Amino acid sequence: GSCCSLRCKVDIILKNTLNMKQITLHVYQSIDGCPVPSDKHFDAAVDASGCVLIDEETYLRIYLNHLGWPITAKETLVVTNGCIDLTENERVKFIQKDAVAELKRMKEDGDGTVVAYGEEIGALLLDNGLADEITVTTVPVLVGGGEKALECGLHDGGAWIVRSNKVQVDGKMRTVYGKV
């Protein structure tokens, strides 16, 4: 009867959750919360992921810093308002219309992991409840200025828990937060 149908509904919910892509937002910040460059841990996360999700500003910064596109083994998704394709021969896809709906579709389309990086993409993911995990790496420096490494406009009401917290050999603090 009703117990079996409840169990079936729970199983379906769990299967749907397990078959969704997991989006992990990587944030690199100074002690005072300002953005700092990513490190080898981020490179390893990119290598282990199914694809990379970034914003337009991050795309341009990566392209200009490397004088080309360094992420060739993975598909990179760039959320943008305009057409800024500097990498037409690489595995880069631009999301220009209704990014939230497109990201929700992508998230529901199978399993795997997506690594996200960039201040604007972080705000988009957090404001729309799309991030499953946040990995914050705090570098022991003071940068100063008004720019923050992680900004979001809306509070989604969801709770986050610390999954791990570790001091790295180089003095950086890496904290992984997960949704409750």
Predicted regions and their residues:
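Enzymes that bind and transform nitrogen-containing heteroaromatic metabolites
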Residues: 14-180
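Cysteine-centered motifs
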Residues: 3-4, 8
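Intrinsic disorder/low-complexity segments
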Residues: 1-2, 13
